[in-house]
Amino acid sequence: MTRRPDRKDVATVDELHASATKLVGLDDFGTDDDNYREALGVLLDAYQGEAGLTVLGSKMNRFFLRGALVARLLSQSAWKQYPEHVDVAIKRPIFVTGLVRTGTTALHRLLGADPA
């Protein structure tokens, strides 16, 4: 992929996959049972045809979408590494919500550090 600093399109599905793969060194995005590739293509078409993104807006969305694909790669890798976790029931999930800069990240990390 050639870098174009003035690029106004966000990217193609294949370019985003290649970028995410290069970043983390993984290439298994899992099955496409949820049709995420098609949905990603629709989103990219909308960015290109409807959103009127600036060059900066395109870069920001490219970065955001690549991050989502990296998360998918890491998640798939973890499911493959620990397949027994599929059978673990989550009985009482905890949702941490709040406004920006109110300590939700700190609370989330604190809860995540609990060995129980």
Regions found by a protein language model. Give the residues of each.
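PAPS-dependent sulfotransferase catalytic core
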Residues: M1-A116
